[in-house]
């Protein structure tokens, strides 16, 4: 019979949050250690073929919310040439090192806000990323780190890493999947300025090289 194709969704995408109050605790981590953990997590994005008890084959692959379904030919092509996430890993390494150069402390720890993937705390010059983001692999981690790096650049624009962030004047057109993100309860008490800061970061987080450019320009 025809092969079965089974896409599986990872856990709901974690949305970065930023500019929260300080939270004690957390552990410093270095880039090589994180990249090592991400290399393991990236294996989940390799499609696999599973033999069925009655004969035939089932092809299983993971997809992110909003991604189109893959055809059998596309799945087989991915199995022959699995994603390396080399661009994402390079971005993570460069961003991480630049942030450390700027005196930013990076912690893999639970952010203060429930459900947050990441947060930038200028008062403590600390950037926190939820450990579960590592489990999602390099693509998601690069996106979250880039989002938070944009917030760091917003602080630099205001005078330095310890300054309260100010808008950079970036485009604020949100992609369809994030169109309602600022209507979540998390942002109920956000000021107009805070909404603008978040809109800038969300609208540009997919431009993975942008965070580093903004840090170099403003910090």
PLM regions with names:
Residues 1-4, 12-13:
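Bacterial Sec-dependent signal peptides at the C-terminal "C-region" and cleavage site
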Residues 3, 102-104, 112, 164-219:
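Metalloprotease/metallohydrolase-associated module, dominated by Zn2+-dependent proteases
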Residues 4-7, 18, 28-125:
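Auxiliary, metal-adjacent structural segments of Zn-dependent hydrolase domains
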Residues 90, 94, 140, 144, ...:
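Extracytoplasmic/secreted proteins, especially bacterial periplasmic and envelope-associated proteins
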Residues 110-112, 131-133, 156-159:
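A mature extracytoplasmic/lumenal domain signature
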Residues 118-127, 174-182:
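Short alpha-helical hairpin
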Residues 128-145:
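Short pre-active-site segment immediately N-terminal to the catalytic Zn-binding motif
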Residues 149-167:
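Catalytic Zn2+-binding segment of zinc metalloproteases
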